[in-house]
From Swiss-Prot:
Protein name, UniProt field: Methionyl-tRNA formyltransferase
Class in the EC hierarchy, top level: transferase
PANTHER family: METHIONYL-TRNA FORMYLTRANSFERASE (PTHR11138), METHIONYL-TRNA FORMYLTRANSFERASE, MITOCHONDRIAL (PTHR11138:SF5)
Family membership: Belongs to the Fmt family.
GO molecular function list: methionyl-tRNA formyltransferase activity
The keyword Transferase appears for this protein: yes
Keywords: Protein biosynthesis, Transferase
Annotated function: Attaches a formyl group to the free amino group of methionyl-tRNA(fMet). The formyl group appears to play a dual role in the initiator identity of N-formylmethionyl-tRNA by promoting its recognition by IF2 and preventing the misappropriation of this tRNA by the elongation apparatus.
Reactions catalysed according to its record: L-methionyl-tRNA(fMet) + (6R)-10-formyltetrahydrofolate = N-formyl-L-methionyl-tRNA(fMet) + (6S)-5,6,7,8-tetrahydrofolate + H(+)
SUPFAM superfamilies: FMT C-terminal domain-like (SSF50486), Formyltransferase (SSF53328)
Length: 317
């Protein structure tokens, strides 16, 4: 089948590789423009572009997909199907209506739950025990189209975004190939979503990274693993940003202390009071340093019981 593939990050590259391996005719790849990344802010191509170049697939990187010139280019490619995986932009009607087999999307949630740009993050932050991937026919709405296939995965109590991302990238690629085969046979189902059940996974912003110690230990633990490895969560210690990368929830103790108060400091972790129970910090990263386990952190830094995290200023009591 003649396919135009639209996608940008690693999650999308996994699906593109599956199409290539399945022998599908990917006639072009559309991806976001190269952008500066990392501390050096060096311009880097998106993972999808890197893969497309490896297989000598033509790459388009328009700054806008709404201009007539781009739409004409896609039309001239005569795609039977357009596959969209984490592309990062809303497709105009002119593109949606172009391919005879439709525009197909691989979305990293069990629709209609977690529509939007950060479904894996929010599923974990909200403490879900299950998520998955859905393939669907795209329409004008945001993740509102008729569903084709679904595949679910369980979320363990210590699973991070990184772990679930990799599972869903692989499952989504397999589901996409199944979906393409159904399209080729003209027997793909169209299952309407129940819009009344829809929930949303909005784009992550800087304010979402801040740890609120006045939440429960469970909520904070879910927050930390729901932002690992990107973009991370943080608190303030000694007037510096202290990123928290890994936590566990120990047995509950009845302790009278304000949320954010450091209760114990040991090589096994930093025990902090929350609004509901305690949480043990296992891996962290002080501003200007690299991420490390608590044991290594305490070799160079001293954090005392009584310290209140989250406050600008001194080291606490």
């Amino acid at each position: 089948m003649r396919i135009v593939f639209m996608g940008t990050p690693d999650f999308a590259a996994t699906s593109l590789k599956a199409l290539i391996d399945a022998g599908q005719q990917v006639v072009a790849v559309v991806t976001q423009p190269d952008k500066p990344k990392g501390r050096g802010r060096q311009v880097q191509p998106p993972p999808v572009k890197v893969l497309a170049n490896e297989y000598k697939i033509p790459v388009l990187q328009p700054t806008s997909i709404k201009i007539n010139e781009f739409q004409q280019t896609i039309e001239e490619l005569k795609p039977e199907c357009i596959v969209v995986v984490a592309y990062g932009k809303i497709l105009p009607t002119e593109i949606l209506e172009l391919p005879p087999k439709g525009c197909i999307n691989v979305h990293a949630s069990l629709l209609p739950y977690y529509r939007g740009s950060a479904p894996i993050h929010w599923a974990i932050i909200n403490g879900e025990e299950e998520t998955g991937v859905t393939t669907m026919f795209m329409d004008k709405g945001m993740d509102t189209g008729d569903m084709i296939l679904k595949s679910s995965v369980s979320i363990g109590p210590s699973d991070t975004v990184g772990a679930i991302h990799d599972k869903l990238a692989s499952d989504g690629a397999k589901l996409l190939i199944e979906t393409i085969h159904l399209l080729e046979e003209d027997c793909a189902p169209r299952i309407p979503q129940n819009h009344k059940l829809a929930t949303y996974a909005p784009m992550l912003r800087k304010e979402h990274e801040l740890i609120h110690w006045d939440l429960s230990a469970k909520d904070i633990h879910n927050h930390v693993r729901g932002m690992n490895p990107w973009p991370g969560t943080y608190t303030i210690w000694d007037n510096k940003i202290l990123k928290i990368w890994q936590t566990t929830i120990p047995a509950h103790q009845n302790i009278d202390a304000d949320p954010g108060t450091v209760l114990e400091v040991s090589p096994s972790g930093i025990l902090v009071q929350t609004a509901g129970g305690q949480i043990l910090i296992k891996e962290l990263q002080l501003q200007g340093s690299r991420r490390m386990e608590v044991t290594e952190f305490l070799r160079g830094k001293q954090m005392s019981p009584g310290t209140v995290l989250g406050f600008e200023g001194g080291r606490g009591n």
